[in-house]
Amino acid sequence: MSFSVKGRSLRGNNNGGTGTKCGRWNPTVEQLKILTDLFRAGLRTPTTDQIQKISTELSFYGKIESKNVFYWFQNHKARERQKRRKISIDFDHHHHQPSTRDVFEISEEDCQEEEKVIETLQLFPVNSFEDSNSKVDKMRARGNNQYREYIRETTTTSFSPYSSCGAEMEHPPPLDLRLSFL
C-alpha cells in the first residue's frame, strides 16, 4: 500500500496542533482525515511496517508516534463494532416489539388457561423411589427429620454409600430431582 502526502500543514510539528505539551496525543484535522480515509479504504489492522510508514507520513502534520496509529486503528475498529452491535440490537428490538393491537387484544382462548400438570421425570431410577413417591411426599409433609430417617432406611444396604459395614453414617438426603414449575 502506498501512502502519499499532498502537502504540508501550516502548523508543522507543534504537538498535534494544540500548542501545549500534553502526555496525550491530540491528532490534527489532517491526521484524522488521512487515518479515516485509510480506514474507509479497507485498512483495518495495519502491519508494523504499514504503521511505521503511516506515522512517518502523518508526522508532517503534527507530532505522532507509531503507537498512536496502532491504537487509533484498534479504537476505530472497536467503535465500528459497537455501532454495528447497537444497530443490530435496535433493529431486533424494533422488530420483536408487539404491536399495541397485540398487547390489548385478548381472545377467549387466552382467558381460558389450562391447568398446568407437574410431571416428575425419572432421571435416575431407583426402586425404592419408584414405588413410594406418595410415601415420600407424606414423609416430607410430616417433617424433615422423619424424611431423612425414611431415606436412610430405604437406601441403606450393605452396598449403599449410607452404610459402612452395617453402621449408619450421617449424610445429607439425596437431591430431589423432580422438576418444579411453581
UniProtKB/Swiss-Prot annotation:
One of its GO terms (molecular function) is DNA-binding transcription factor activity. Residues 20-84 bind DNA. GO terms for cellular component: nucleus. The keyword DNA-binding applies. Specifically expressed in the central cells of a quiescent center (QC) of the root. Residues 1-24 are annotated as: Disordered. Keywords: Developmental protein, DNA-binding, Homeobox, Nucleus, Transcription, Transcription regulation. CDD domains: homeodomain (cd00086). The keyword Protein transport does not apply. GO terms for biological process: maintenance of root meristem identity; positive regulation of stem cell population maintenance; response to auxin. It holds the Pfam family Homeodomain. Disruption phenotype: Abnormal quiescent center (QC) in the root apical meristem (RAM) and defects in cell differentiation. Gene3D superfamilies: Homeodomain-like. It is found in: Nucleus. Its main location: nucleus. Belongs to the WUS homeobox family. PANTHER family: WUSCHEL-RELATED HOMEOBOX 1-RELATED, WUSCHEL-RELATED HOMEOBOX 5. Transcription factor, which may be involved in the specification and maintenance of the stem cells (QC cells) in the root apical meristem (RAM). This is WUSCHEL-related homeobox 5. It comes from Arabidopsis thaliana (Mouse-ear cress).
